[in-house]
Each structure stands twice: as C-alpha cells, then as structure tokens.
C-alpha cells in the first residue's frame, strides 16, 4: 500500500475535522463514499482511518460507521501526543511563530549530565537555548542538546528555523521515538527574564529523550512552558 496515499487521506480528513467540516460527534462519510472521493482502495481508507483513531480524532463503531470525537482544546499551544515540531504546533493553532536563538555552543558531556540525559561521558553536543514566540508572546524556553555525531553541520540559522526539518530532510535521519517526563516547577530567574510569565510563578517542564530509527539517543531537551498556554492531552483505550 503506498504510504503517501493513505497519509494524504489521513491529513485531508484530519484538516476537515479540525476545521469542523466534520463536527464533534458527527459521523464521517461512509467507506464507499471516501473510496470514491479519494479514488483509492478500501484498505487505504481503513489505514487512514486507523491513524485518525490512534490520534484520538475518531472512533470506529462496528457496523455503524466512524464518529468524530475530536474537540479543540482552548488556547493550548502545545499538545502532548505525537512528536510535533514547533512550526507544526503553530500551524495547527493558526498562530504566527518566531524562534529566537539565545545561546548556541558546543559542550562535552560530564558524568553528572550523562546520568541525567542518557548520553555517554565525553560525547560532544550542540547546546542550544531558544525562545519560542507565538503571536508575539514568549511562551516556551527550549534548552536543547543534540549529539554532534548524528546532527553535523548545525548552525544558529537552522536552529532559528527548524532543527527537525534539517535532520529529516537534509540529513535523512528518521526520528522515531520520544520519551517524555512532565513536571511543574517554580519559575527560575531565566524563565522570568525570557518568557512572558504574567502572574504565573511556575512553568510546565517537558523533558524529552529522542531516538532515531536505530534506537540511538540523539537529543535531550528541556522545554519550559508558560502554564497558561500549555495542555497535557493523551488518548487512552481500555483493553480487556
């Protein structure tokens, strides 16, 4: 089955759901209708629908169709779930995105950071600090560490645009898995200086360890979010 075909159908239906062309609790068109509309096989439509089920957009009901269960999540700018880039997040929320690189240097992993990050002692890393702006508000402070061996040629200009786009489309590396830990912490002086904190005295902190197709760690990131614009959202399915 051509991957591009079912992914194109998946993205098309997903956009319609997000635009509420298919509103919450409505039924999607029948399989036969979708097959005719997209000029594809039944298996291709079912693969696209399975992706939407996995993302929490729809729920299948045997013999009764496919119901939309997606609802917009208020003013959230970051939804935990898939591995989503900052630019993708901005597009999903229809917000204007700007990234300002405030630090870009090379560091060597010591024993303390190795224990925390999962990198090996002596590894050479890109150490990057970036402030993420959405519609003019400084809402996210990203502190990134990328293994130079796997991400060569990184520059501040690339960091200000999209590191993941560079990794995937220039270096050709597949980004497969991200392990995340989410906590709420008191805002630091650095948070107060760089983010539009308002009256918030805390930040939502997401720590990521990201792995490539070979299962090798290439990124350790701490993202510090202004809490008024942060949302944790997950999809859980009960298995019997």
Task: Annotate the PLM regions.
Residues 1-42:
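Extreme N-terminal segment that seeds HTH/winged-HTH DNA-binding domains in transcriptional regulators
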Residues 4-6, 30, 67-81:
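Short, cationic-aromatic polyanion-contact patches
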Residues 22-23, 58, 138:
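Conserved hydrophobic residue
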Residues 49-50:
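Short, hydrophobic-biased segments on the C-terminal half of alpha helices
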Residues 54-63, 69:
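Beta-hairpin "wing" of winged helix-turn-helix
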Residues 78-93, 102-107:
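Short, positionally conserved secondary-structure boundary motifs
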Residues 96-240:
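C-terminal all-alpha effector/ligand-binding and dimerization domain
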């Amino acid at each position: 089955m051509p991957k591009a075909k079912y992914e194109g159908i998946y993205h098309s239906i997903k956009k319609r759901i997000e635009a509420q062309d298919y509103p919450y609790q409505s039924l999607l068109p029948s399989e036969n209708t979708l097959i005719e509309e997209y000029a594809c096989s039944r298996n291709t439509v079912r693969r696209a629908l399975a992706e939407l089920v996995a993302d929490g957009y729809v729920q299948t009901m045997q013999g009764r169709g496919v119901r939309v269960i997606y609802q917009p999540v208020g003013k959230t700018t970051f939804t935990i779930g898939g591995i989503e880039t900052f630019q993708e997040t901005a597009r999903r929320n229809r917000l204007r995105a700007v990234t300002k690189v405030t630090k870009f240097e090379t560091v060597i992993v010591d024993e303390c950071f190795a224990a925390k990050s999962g990198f090996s002692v002596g590894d050479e890393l890109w150490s990057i600090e970036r402030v993420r702006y959405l519609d003019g508000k400084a809402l996210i402070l990203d502190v990134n560490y990328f293994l130079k061996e796997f991400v060569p040629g990184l520059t501040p200009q690339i960091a200000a645009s999209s590191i993941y786009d560079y990794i995937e489309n220039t270096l050709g590396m597949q980004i497969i898995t991200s392990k995340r830990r989410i906590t709420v912490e008191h805002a630091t002086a650095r948070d107060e200086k760089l983010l539009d904190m308002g009256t918030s005295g805390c930040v939502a902190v997401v720590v990521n360890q990201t792995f490539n197709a070979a299962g090798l760690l290439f990124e350790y990131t701490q993202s510090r979010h202004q809490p008024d614009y942060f949302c944790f959202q997950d999809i859980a399915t009960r298995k019997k």
